[in-house]
Design a protein with these regions (language model features):
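Catalytic cores of RNA-modifying enzymes
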Residues: 1-242, 275, 286, 295, ...
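Surface-exposed charge patches
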Residues: 29, 257, 272
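Mid-to-C-terminal catalytic subdomains of enzymes
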Residues: 283
Length: 305
């Protein structure tokens, strides 16, 4: 059952207090008081660095009239900063055990609403339409669990949502991939996917010590500014993304091998499509530009009929 939980609904029941969520001892005390234990399966690493959250909030809410959709508020450190800068903040949290924690830590934030649901299953068009009707623009700000980084970002980008930009904390390695140049040495399928919908840039690195518990890797904050239109216009988006996925599936081999294995077509058919697209039959996927991948997908589409 979906539970929409507004922080301000029952805030009068709590004694107003200032909670220093950047103090690890206070954080541990709050969590212990509510009997909360971190879940490895949910990838819970809560951001508590007082120097990071204001910078993320500044990037996401550049105007007081903005609405911000937050994914995974944790204990509310970033949420609190967003509430100071935005017209309204709606935070989607999967773990219902965090609701009473957030009720306490965000009791002074009258423009924050917590939605207890799975971001990957939500109808985001409906949510944005209902929750941000009075906001001039809508942005996304999130400290994403590493294991759902790509699915969440691609959902936000591909569903044609009325978003201005996405500011998100991800694993450093993933940040490098998202922000890589298509056709460069770090280019991958997710690089192409992101660049299809947005301009990506790395904002700043975040050390692992900024979280509780500390993960084993460092993170980085990236900004994805959505394009007004598409960067390329393949004949079929479905074929385009299937082509990209297949082409990058065997990074140490030529695109022919990836296309053949990933799309279940013969190497001869894959080679013919590559040559019709004006490309070398020995080309590797990571060397291809967006325009070349678009041309290739159009030719692959002919082989799939």
């Amino acid at each position: 059952m979906k539970i929409s939980y507004s922080v301000w609904k029952d805030s009068k029941r709590l004694k107003k207090m200032s909670v220093d969520l950047a103090d690890i001892n206070i954080v541990k005390s709050v969590l212990a008081r509510h009997g909360f234990a971190f879940s490895k399966s949910l990838g819970q690493n809560f951001l508590i660095d007082s120097s990071v959250c204001p910078r993320m909030a500044d990037a996401a809410a550049t105007d007081k009239s903005y609405g911000v959709l937050e994914v995974g508020p944790g204990i509310g450190v970033l949420t609190s900063e967003l509430s100071k800068r935005a017209e309204k903040v709606v935070s989607v949290e999967l773990d219902k055990r965090l609701l009473p924690v957030l009720h306490e830590t965000l009791c002074d934030c009258n423009n924050v609403e917590i939605v207890n649901d799975d971001i990957l299953k939500l109808d985001l068009k409906k949510l944005i339409s209902e929750k941000f009707a009075d906001c001039s623009e809508v942005t996304v700000c999130a400290n994403l669990p590493y294991y759902i980084t790509s699915p969440v970002i691609m959902k936000l980008l591909s569903e044609q949502l009325p978003l201005k930009k996405i500011v998100v904390m991800v694993q450093k390695e993933a940040a490098d991939r998202f922000c890589a140049e298509v056709g460069g040495k770090n280019s991958g399928a997710v690089t192409v996917g992101v660049n299809y919908y947005a301009d990506a840039r790395l904002l700043f690195p975040v050390p692992r010590e900024s979280f509780i518990p500390s993960p084993k890797v460092d993170s980085a904050v990236i900004e994805l500014t959505l394009l007004d239109g598409k960067r390329v216009t393949p004949k079929s988006e479905k074929v385009f993304f299937n082509t990209v996925k297949a082409a990058f599936s065997m990074r140490r081999k030529t695109a022919v091998n990836g296309l053949s294995g990933g799309l279940c077509i013969s190497k001869e058919a894959a080679t013919a499509a590559i040559e019709r697209a004006g490309l070398s039959p020995t080309v590797r996927a990571e060397k291809l530009s967006m325009e070349e991948l678009s041309r290739l997908s159009d030719e692959i589409g002919k082989e799939l009929k």
